[in-house]
Amino acid sequence: TWGTYASVIERNVKPAIGAVRLDELKPAHFRRMERYVMDEQGKSSGTAGSAWRTLHKALEDAVLEGVIERNPAVKGTAPRVALKERAALTPEQAADLIAAETDDTWRLMWMLAFMTGMRQGERLGLTEDELRRDGDRLIILVEWQAQHLTKREVEGLPKGVECTPLGNGMYRTRPKTEKGRRAIPLPQALADQLLAYIERHGMNKDGLVFHDDEGIPLTGCVERRRWYRALDRVGLNHEYGPHS
């Protein structure tokens, strides 16, 4: 997301090599940035790799805009990322967590996460317009996501980027890539629960399925707190994520 790109630039790129002119960047500067992220900030190789990819993309855009003639990152080498296996709930653990959830909003959230693979922003930004029918089957046509953006991040978005304020610091944006826009057929039991939930709670003014009692959008921070409570409820530690 654009918010993530801006954050990476501010936290990892500028402090390390922000004083260097674009047309003077060399492979040594990229290595300096990698050392800054990993040695001085104590971050992982994955974070260093994210900074490198973000800068590479920014420089590629600078070439297209005619700001510089070539992308100096082409001669550099991306940091080697040490692969770390993510902890994942077993199907039995996921079923127990869902069954133990006492709030119908979050029970449905966890069901969507585990049964469809929908990402956090896609679930938080789910709208009535994304619900379609294919014969008797209900389909979610993922076209939007909801993400938290600061005023500065919104002002820094390139022209043409679709970004609609939803309230509570949340904005409706398109998925990062075309692959993110996809159709997800729902199992009948999940479809029935989703439609029943909408019947009980209705949409907010922006058509969001998930919102609080006052129609305010839910945020990733709220989900994270509820997720940890759900893990605690079934005796699991916090190493697991709702996308596992």
Locations of the language-model features?
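Short, solvent-exposed alpha-helical surface patches in well-structured domains
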Residues: 4, 32, 50, 75, ...
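Short, basic (Lys/Arg/His-rich) helix/loop patches that form interaction surfaces
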Residues: 41, 45, 96-106, 116, ...
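N-terminal core-binding DNA-recognition domain of tyrosine site-specific recombinases/integrases
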Residues: 1-67, 83, 216-222, 235-244
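C-terminal catalytic core of Y-nucleophile DNA break-rejoin enzymes
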Residues: 139-141, 148-165, 172-195, 206-228
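Conserved hydrophobic/aromatic pocket- or pore-lining residues that grip, position, or stack substrates
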Residues: 13, 30, 55-58, 66, ...
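Charged catalytic carboxylate motif
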Residues: 8, 29, 50-54, 93, ...
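Basic, Lys/Arg- and aromatic-enriched nucleic-acid-binding interface segment
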Residues: 45-51, 64, 68-126, 133-137, ...
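Short, polar N-cap/turn motifs at the start of nucleic acid-interacting alpha helices
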Residues: 130-139, 237-239
